[in-house]
């Protein structure tokens, strides 16, 4: 069973009301008046404590052998840099024994110039690169590259190709992912998936085109194609 890391742990904003009371009270007074707080608003110890509590919260699944991977999905403003690499390494240190999978939403990580560096960095720290299929043509678009950086686990997330809705303001997450893959589009991934399966012990294919029954139907189609 996979889990996405809590927003603040991957530099996303969060509503202060969602924080534990003692963590919220540790924030500077000016931060408490905001509707959204970011990691920069937290004392370092408070953010580390959030990581610790997240880790403890997953312990029952960990002990029962039912914890899959923790998804570290970084936002579109999280560009490649030394500081942001250190941020990822810090997450690795604070979640030391878990399988961590990294998904980028900023294209700089997988640009032609930086791609090899990014994949080598993830491999060095035992992190799974999350390959994605998503709308192309946006500054943040990640190319549909299948890559294995951890020989235990590879992941592909299919977000759909609804370019019209992808960045349109005011839409729900489900509306952004409102897309049904054609047979031809799924077939594009078959050789990539088979190659990944030769490099990683486990390959997870996750349909995130979660609008109506589209994810379920496409998952069944892809499973049938793979035999």
Region roles according to the model:
Residues 2-227:
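Residues lining hydrophobic/aromatic ligand-binding pockets adjacent to catalytic sites
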């Amino acid at each position: 069973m996979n889990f996405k890391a809590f927003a603040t742990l991957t530099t996303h904003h969060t509503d202060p009301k969602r924080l534990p009371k003692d963590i919220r009270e540790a924030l500077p007074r000016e931060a408490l008046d905001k509707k959204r707080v970011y990691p920069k608003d937290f004392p370092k110890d408070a953010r580390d404590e959030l990581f610790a509590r997240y880790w403890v919260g997953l312990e029952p699944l960990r002990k029962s052998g039912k914890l899959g991977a923790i998804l570290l999905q970084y936002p579109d403003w999280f560009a490649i840099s030394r500081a942001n690499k250190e941020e990822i390494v810090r997450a690795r240190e604070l979640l030391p024994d878990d399988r961590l999978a990294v998904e980028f939403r900023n294209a700089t990580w997988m640009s032609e110039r930086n791609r090899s560096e990014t994949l080598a960095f993830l491999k060095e720290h035992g992190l799974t690169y999350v390959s994605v299929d998503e709308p192309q043509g946006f500054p943040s678009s990640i190319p549909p590259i299948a890559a294995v950086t951890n020989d235990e686990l590879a992941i592909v997330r299919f977000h759909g190709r609804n370019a019209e809705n992808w960045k349109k303001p005011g839409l729900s997450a489900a509306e952004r992912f409102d897309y049904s893959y054609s047979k031809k589009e799924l077939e594009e991934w078959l050789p990539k998936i088979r190659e990944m399966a030769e490099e990683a012990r486990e390959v997870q294919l996750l349909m995130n085109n979660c609008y109506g029954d589209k994810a379920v139907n496409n998952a069944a189609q892809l499973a049938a194609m793979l035999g």
